[in-house]
From Swiss-Prot:
Keywords of the record: ATP-binding, Coiled coil, Cytoplasm, Cytoskeleton, Methylation, Microtubule, Motor protein, Nucleotide-binding, Phosphoprotein
Biased composition (Pro residues): 404-419, 1000-1018, 1062-1080
Any Pfam family the entry gives: Kinesin_assoc
Lineage: Eukaryota, Metazoa, Chordata, Craniata, Vertebrata
Protein name per UniProt: Kinesin-like protein KIF1C
Compositional bias annotation for Basic residues: 1019-1029
Domain of life where this protein originates: Eukaryota
């Protein structure tokens, strides 16, 4: 039996009164073991299918041949689990589903014949088999315990002395257990039924007094079943101990539909914690089965429920789960979530072993070996007389026992039985860490308690059980709860004549569980010195009294008289004066105690008289919901308005917290060391996750989406730049943990946060396929960033599931993770489609980015061409010089003549051999190294351009021809040089930038010398190629003669490949000038030197 999977069954219930009143439609269908569900908002889509071990159709009546009754559910699940218990295995059955889905009905049932649940039927069948199989060599003992887990606190329901929360501990051999939990001995099914009823009463009283809800607490009913057998041949006694755990989990309830607030929100948070932790444990165990590595951490201790169920979930147990479903379309989301939960559970495998003594195990193995050898010898033709005197006994397994003369040696006590399918490590005192005296004393006391319980005899356990029963009855009698005449408290019996009160509770299991008699005369209700004792909020010491007075005709009239200041309501109306009660009236005392008044004799007399029933309760049942609705209607409170008010309060709270988060993010952005976009997005993501997760604990995903859409997400005020596809991902800093020690669980949590943030930024427009694609990509990116192995292939599914549970998904895009082949194929197609869509989006984004880059490059080329047309060139360019990539300016005549070679942007400059550092290189170095020099040169260049623009305008007005510039095509793969490294404002300030394309330059046929302006010297015809002078042209070091002699060889222009060019004719030998001569402005000739008075004397 080792390594068996968890058995999973689903059961759909009929419509309840609320669903019938809303004309709900059934969206669940079953065919064999396959369960399908249809999205009511997307009815054209294919249904989502799930396959389980059992699918029970209980939506219709008994007349339907497909109807699954309580007996059928027990035959399929209960009998199999009981058989495993007799074999010596631990057994667990737990029910899961939303509130009102039928969990308690499946587990507990009702008192009517044929309506009993799994727990009563299993207990009754247990004692039936015990009575049949009991003999002198085989004896049985049964002990039970009943506890409740509410708000992470454990409460003992069978011990009236247990007031506070019990402590959960874990023993290295016994496993998790509840300290001081009472285990009571029982001898019949009646005893078990008595204890179950007492536990339910205690649960009801505590829940009503403390304003708790039973559906918000987990109930665990445990049966310890021991089988003792005596072997007459060996004289050894052996035991097999089975623990049967029957769990009724709390239902999931939506805060918006219940109007939960205050304490209810805290309860919901704790229930969400337990159920969420249970889901995480189930997911981790399911992932554990799909890979070889077995060292993953299972978060059992995150909640009390999972800690106590540690052995039942993936441990030493045979486990079955029953998922209760609602068929209504208004509960589609909860039903689909339950189906996915159950589908995940069926992947868990438990390693169950038989819990027996080592001696019994050894004897059983030897008997099986002897039987095998005997069959082998018999198959070879040997007779029974030749088998060595082996004796056959009917009751032994295999029918063979070893000879009595040689009994097997007992097993060594140093080898304990297996635990969870593996051998327990030996605990030596030297290996244990050093502990303090207080912890040592605590361990000693706990060990002594365990030893005392193990050594306690059966008679002592029975006496203890009887003492606790007497204490419970005394406590109930003190509270005014009615008991039977024989002292038993099994069920709720209705007196035939006596008027009485029956409690009503939100949980159907706890409703009509307590009965209070109204005796003749006066019956007082309150907290102190009363006949019916009630506690809780708004219950006064003397709250009210019931006066029972017989009438002359034999009828007993009961009058309710409230005390001053006590809140007492009858049929929803506040009572301040004495009021005669009628049978069926609803009475509310305080805020939590709800009763229904029953008067059997009065009802019988009215039926005999033919009195028509009063227009009180309608056809719907008179239960707790009806009483609460009636109370609110009578007080003028609209439930829908209250729900809207509650939602508005939550929205205002979210808005306030968002404003605080915005202020905090803004401060962090202003004062933090790093102000990069990654850090800003990271802080916004953390704050958004904090607000969304806190809001999700109180509201469903759809309501969370609406609130976030209206209010927005926290932001630091910094514009969020879109992330490029080719952007290198930066390492994220995990909150509160060193990234080197990040685990896979931390990466999953980080992925959930970031995906929820992205989905919220996109206004929750992501569907299921998109969320799955994001989860897969995010997990792969995080694993690669932190150097972690990607682990199992379906790790992203857990991330996607957490995202669905937190922010939901777009309507119509949800899909089921069903177990059928069609569902799996559909999920695969959706995955491929999502992957293709993602790749298409990536390619489109890359294309857009490349197009933008091309547009930027084209704009730069056009801008450089426009600048080229504006800036005049003073050098005559020839075709050969253009091919060489150099521009040579002809020196002017005179002592200040200079010749320098200036490189263009096509090729690097040719450095002369002498002097060692040219003026161009010196200027370039200063521009790169000296910021002050760079600013001054840029400022000077702008001034010169403005002056040159003014001179050109004056020359144009004088009728002169403007020299067309040479065409210069900037390189595509070369870094821009000065002056294009200046700021954009400087480039836009140059003249001609805003104009359109200038016409291509055409060389004129004749050269026209522009007339000289007044008071200026006309240009000399002997110097048509004079260059512009400035203060950085080398000064006197570069002055040469005024003759136009040929250039030295080392100063001649070179080609890119190093080959020299052919000698070019001088300007004087050319047939005509290529461009018109250029006149140098007088004020631009010298900057730092004194003016040349000799040359300028004529002009002056």
């Amino acid at each position: 039996m080792a390594g068996a999977s968890v058995k999973v069954a689903v059961r759909v219930r009929p419509f309840n009164a609320r669903e019938t009143s809303q004309d709900a439609k059934c969206v669940v269908s079953m065919q064999g073991n396959t369960t399908s569900i249809i999205n009511p908002k997307q009815s054209k889509d294919a249904p989502k299918s799930f396959t389980f071990d059992y699918s029970y159709w209980s939506h219709t009546s008994v007349e339907d041949p497909q109807f699954a009754s309580q007996q059928q559910v027990y035959r399929d699940i209960g009998e199999e689990m009981l058989l495993h218990a007799f074999e010596g295995y631990n057994v667990c059955i737990f029910a899961y589903g939303q509130t009102g889905a039928g969990k308690s009905y499946t587990m507990m049932g009702r008192q009517e014949p044929g309506q009993q649940g799994i727990v009563p039927q299993l207990c009754e069948d247990l004692f039936s088999r015990v009575n049949v199989n009991q003999s002198a060599q085989l004896s049985y003992s049964v002990e039970v315990s009943y506890m409740e887990i509410y708000c992470e606190r454990v409460r003992d329901l069978l011990n009236p002395k247990s007031r506070g929360s019990l402590r959960v501990r874990e023993h290295p051999i016994l496993g998790p257990y509840v300290q001081d939990l009472s285990k009571l001995a029982v001898t019949s099914y009646a005893d078990i039924a008595d204890l179950m009823d007492c536990g339910n009463k205690a649960r009801t009283v505590a829940a009503t007094n403390m304003n708790e809800t039973s559906s918000r607490s987990h109930a665990v009913f445990t049966i310890v079943f021991t089988q003792r057998s005596h072997d007459q041949l060996t004289g050894l006694d052996s035991e097999k101990v089975s623990k049967i755990s029957l769990v009724d989990l709390a239902g999931s309830e939506r805060a918006d539909s219940s109007g939960a607030r205050g304490m209810r929100l805290k309860e919901g948070a704790n229930i969400n914690k337990s159920l969420t932790t249970l889901g995480k444990v189930i997911s981790a165990l399911a992932d554990l089965q799909s890979k070889k590595r077995k060292s993953d951490f299972i978060p059992y201790r995150d909640s009390v429920l999972t800690w106590l169920l540690k052995e039942n979930l993936g441990g030493n147990s045979r486990t079955a789960m029953i998922a209760a479903l609602s068929p209504a379309d208004i509960n589609y989301e909860e039903t689909l979530s339950t189906l996915r939960y159950a589908d995940r559970t069926k992947q868990i495998r438990c390693n169950a072993v038989i819990n027996e003594d080592p001696n019994a195990r050894l004897i059983r193995e030897l008997q099986e070996e002897v039987a095998r050898l005997r069959d082998l010898l018999m198959a070879q033709g040997l007779s029974a007389s030749a088998l060595g005197g082996l004796k056959v006994e009917e009751g032994s397994p295999g029918g063979v026992l070893p000879p009595a003369s040689s009994p097997p040696a007992p097993a060594s006590p140093s080898s304990p039985p297996p635990h969870n399918g593996e051998l327990e490590p030996s605990f030596s005192p030297s290996a244990e860490p050093q502990i303090g005296p207080e912890e040592a004393m605590e361990r000693l006391q706990e060990t002594e308690k365990i030893i005392a319980e193990l050594n306690e005899t059966w008679e002592e356990k029975l006496r203890k059980t009887e003492a606790l029963r007497m204490e419970r009855e005394a406590l109930l009698a003190e509270m005014g709860v009615a008991v039977r005449e024989d002292g038993g408290t099994v069920g709720v019996f209705s007196p035939k004549k006596t008027p009485h009160l029956v409690n009503l509770n939100e949980d159907p299991l706890m409703s009509e569980c307590l009965l209070y008699h109204i005796k003749d005369g006066v019956t007082r209700v309150g907290q102190v010195d009363v006949d019916i004792k009630l506690t809780g909020q708004f219950i006064r010491e003397q709250h009210c009294l019931f006066r029972s007075i017989p009438q002359p005709d034999g009828e007993v009239m009961v009058t309710l008289e409230p005390c001053e200041g006590a809140e007492t309501y009858v049929n929803g109306k506040l009572v301040t004066e004495p009021l005669v009660l009628k049978s069926g009236n609803r009475i509310v005392m305080g805020k939590n105690h709800v009763f229904r008044f029953n008067h059997p004799e009065q009802a019988r007399l009215e039926r005999e008289r033919g009195v028509p029933p009063p227009p009180g309760p309608p056809s719907e049942p008179v239960d707790w919901n009806f009483a609460q609705k009636e109370l609110l209607e009578q007080q003028g409170i609209d439930i829908k308005l209250e729900m809207e008010k509650r939602l508005q309060d939550l929205e205002n709270q979210y808005r306030k917290e968002k404003e605080e988060a915005d202020l905090l993010l803004e401060q962090q952005r202003l004062y933090a060391d790093s102000d990069s976009g990654e850090d800003s997005d990271k802080r916004s993501c953390e704050e958004s996750w904090r607000l969304i997760s806190s809001l999700r604990e109180q509201l469903p995903p759809t309501t969370v989406q609406n609130i976030v859409k209206r209010c927005g997400l926290p932001s630091s005020g910094k514009r969020r730049a879109p992330r490029r596809v080719y952007q290198i991902p930066q390492r994220r800093r995990l909150q509160g943990k060193d990234p080197r020690w990040a685990t896979m669980a931390d990466l999953k949590m980080q992925a959930v946060k970031e995906i929820c943030y992205e989905v919220a930024l996109a206004d929750f427009r992501h569907g299921r396929a998109e969320i799955e694609a994001l989860a897969a990509l995010k997990m792969r990116e995080l694993c690669r960033t932190y150097g972690k192995p990607e682990g199992p292939g379906d790790a992203w599914r857990a991330v996607a599931r957490d995202v669905w549970d937190t922010v939901g998904e777009e309507e119509g895009c949800g899909g089921g993770g069903g177990g059928s082949e069609e569902g799996a194929r559909g999920a695969e197609v959706e995955d491929l489609r999502a992957h293709i869509d993602k790749l298409t989006g990536i390619l489109q984004e890359v294309k857009l980015q490349n197009s933008s880059k091309d547009r930027e490059l084209q704009a730069l080329r056009d801008r450089m061409l426009r600048m080229e047309r504006v800036i005049p060139l003073t050098q005559d360019l020839e075709d050969d010089n253009d091919e060489s990539g150099l521009v040579t300016w002809a020196p002017p005549e005179g002592p200040e003549a200079v010749e320098e070679t200036v490189p263009n942007d096509h090729s690097p400059a040719v450095r002369p051999t002498s002097p060692p550092l040219s003026s161009w290189e010196r200027v370039s170095r200063l521009m790169e190294e000296d910021p002050a020099f760079r600013r001054g040169r840029l400022r000077w260049l702008k001034q010169e351009q403005l002056r040159l623009q003014g001179l050109q305008g004056a020359g144009g007005r004088g009728g002169g021809l403007r020299r067309p510039p040479a065409r210069f095509v900037p390189p595509h793969d070369c870094k821009l040089r000065f002056p294009f490294k200046s700021n954009p404002q400087h480039r836009e300030s140059w003249p001609g930038m805003g104009s359109g394309e200038a016409p291509a330059p055409q060389p004129p046929e004749e050269v026209t010398v522009p007339p000289a302006p007044p008071n200026r010297r006309p240009p000399s015809p002997r110097r048509p190629h004079r260059s512009r002078r400035n203060s950085l042209d080398g000064g006197s070091r570069s002055r040469g003669g005024g003759s136009t002699q040929p250039e030295p060889q080392h100063l001649r222009p070179q080609k890119h490949n190093g080959y020299p060019q052919q000698p070019q004719p001088s300007p004087a030998q050319r047939p005509g000038p290529r461009y018109p001569p250029y006149t140098t402005p007088p004020r631009m000739r010298r900057q730092r030197s004194a003016p040349d008075l000799k040359e300028s004397g004529a002009a002056v």
